[in-house]
């Protein structure tokens, strides 16, 4: 662990390099000296793979080589005082060339219209959208060792690249720590007399680390997609659907706490930050274990992290018989200092409504935006009274269509779901050919498999929901 901590000292280098601030040069050079060239290169591979997940291995490698060369040259004794600034400027200029060997970003052309420090700042601010569908598949033990023995450095670089582009939303401390631990395992097991036994033992040791990295990548991806306010809304909806027998006072602090943790930790390099997750799991049990039998079962897991994972994947519970929920249209919705009226409405609607969170977050964002516009109009009361019926109709229509798109999915196996879906579509389109029907079943079931579960990826599903709802209307 001490080695990992030292490894993380160089994180500041990337920020300094991208910002082009000379005052950080001394710190960069000290970090490089304490880290050594090999580990500095490894860290750069993780950082830039994470920053440019659509880049190829060759593109990331080119960039890493340039970064390492720049650092070593400009930190050498007797180096030109302008070396650092000149080389970082040249690096950003090279990124703008049409035949640049570096990874590209959709925002790169805009950055390239700027000059000097402004260009570097623009490049540094570029971020890719989260990878919502990781594709990394771990090779077999034999394949791992064959590649490792052939070229240990190439194996390490490719693993760090593959793992980082797939799980790059995990906090940097976890991502770096896990990749280093994994490579240490490979180095030990591929040179041991019995690799199979070694891998079995070492993977067991790494299980918690691996789970934590993968889980934080998932929740931080959702946070990156939603932002702080929508993330709070999303978690409130999920808790209301998972534990509909709870009260708002039970779940609202949990939704706010997890949002705060993610806002602090997803981009943090502090090791202490992620320790808040196990503490949060304990609070989950304190608030909800007596409200729901499935939650109570989750709280029987051995470790806080296992409790958190269990709660995360827990499906929505059957909703109890509840009265209809009316969209609040009085002046209380405009009280920015008191969100309880809207929070109560969101909670009541969510625990009564059987459609996935991505659907509710999508329509509620639009509804809340319309309410906010009324609150900032000349006559908020008149605006609310005028828009209220229309918003209620739109909300009801959207929920109905969402229920149609996801009908039968959560209650059945995928095979049974497809059978029921085919029956429903056959009844809805009696004149459709068998080929057309099969294509429609395949398309709709693929949509359901990605967007009809409790933790569906928001970026992907946001546009897909619109497309599928349009097919219902056509």
UniProtKB/Swiss-Prot annotation:
Disulfide bonds join 29-75, 74-83, 96-112, 111-122, 145-190, 189-198, 220-266, 265-273, 285-299, 298-310, 334-375, 374-383, 406-452, 451-461. One of its GO terms (cellular component) is extracellular space. Coiled coil: none annotated. PROSITE patterns: ALBUMIN_1 (PS00212), ALBUMIN_2 (PS51438). It comes from the Eukaryota. Its main location: secreted. The keyword Transcription regulation does not apply. This is Vitamin D-binding protein. It comes from Bos taurus (Bovine).
């Amino acid at each position: 662990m001490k080695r990992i901590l030292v490894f993380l000292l160089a994180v500041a280098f990337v920020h300094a390099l991208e910002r082009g601030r000379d005052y950080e040069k001394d710190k960069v050079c000290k970090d490089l000296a304490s880290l050594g060239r090999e580990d500095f290169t490894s860290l750069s591979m993780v950082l830039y793979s994470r920053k440019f997940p659509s880049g190829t291995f060759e593109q990331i490698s080119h960039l890493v080589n340039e970064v390492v060369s720049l650092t070593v040259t400009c930190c050498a004794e007797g180096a030109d005082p302008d070396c650092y600034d000149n080389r970082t400027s040249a690096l950003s200029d090279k990124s703008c060339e049409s035949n640049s060997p570096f990874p590209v970003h959709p925002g790169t052309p805009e950055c390239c219209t700027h000059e000097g420090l402004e260009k570097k700042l623009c490049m540094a601010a570029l971020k890719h959208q989260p990878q919502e569908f990781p594709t990394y598949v771990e090779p077999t033990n034999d394949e791992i060792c064959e590649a490792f023995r052939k070229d240990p450095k190439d194996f390490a670089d490719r693993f760090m690249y593959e793992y980082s582009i797939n799980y790059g939303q995990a906090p940097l401390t976890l991502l770096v720590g896990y990749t280093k631990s994994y490579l240490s395992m490979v180095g030990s097991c591929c040179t041991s007399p019995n690799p199979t036994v070694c891998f079995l033992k070492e993977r067991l040791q790494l299980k918690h680390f691996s789970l934590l990295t993968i889980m934080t990548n998932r929740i931080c991806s959702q946070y990156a997609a939603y932002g702080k306010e929508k993330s709070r809304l999303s978690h409130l909806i999920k808790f209301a659907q998972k534990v509909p027998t709870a009260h708002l006072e039970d779940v609202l602090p949990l939704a706010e706490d997890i949002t705060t943790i993610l806002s602090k930790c997803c981009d943090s390099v502090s090791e202490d930050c992620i320790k808040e997750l196990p503490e949060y799991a304990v609070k989950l049990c304190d608030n909800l274990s007596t409200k729901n039998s499935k939650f109570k079962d989750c709280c029987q897991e051995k470790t806080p992290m296992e409790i958190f994972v269990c709660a995360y994947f827990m499906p929505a519970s059957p909703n109890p018989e509840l009265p209809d929920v009316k969209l609040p249209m009085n002046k209380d919705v405009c009280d920015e200092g008191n969100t309880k009226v809207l929070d109560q409405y969101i909670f009541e609607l969510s625990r009564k409504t059987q459609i996935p969170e991505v659907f509710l977050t999508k329509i509620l964002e639009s509804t809340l935006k319309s309410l906010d516009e009324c609150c900032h109009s000349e006559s908020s009361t008149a605006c609310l009274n005028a828009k209220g019926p229309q918003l209620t109709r739109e909300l009801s229509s959207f929920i109905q269509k969402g229920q149609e798109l996801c009908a039968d999915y959560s209650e059945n196996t995928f095979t049974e779901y497809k059978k029921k879906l085919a029956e429903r579509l056959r009844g809805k389109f009696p004149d459709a050919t068998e080929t057309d029907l099969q294509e429609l079943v395949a398309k709709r079931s693929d949509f359901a498999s990605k967007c009809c579960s409790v933790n569906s990826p928001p970026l992907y599903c946001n546009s897909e929901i619109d497309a599928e709802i349009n097919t219902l209307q056509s």
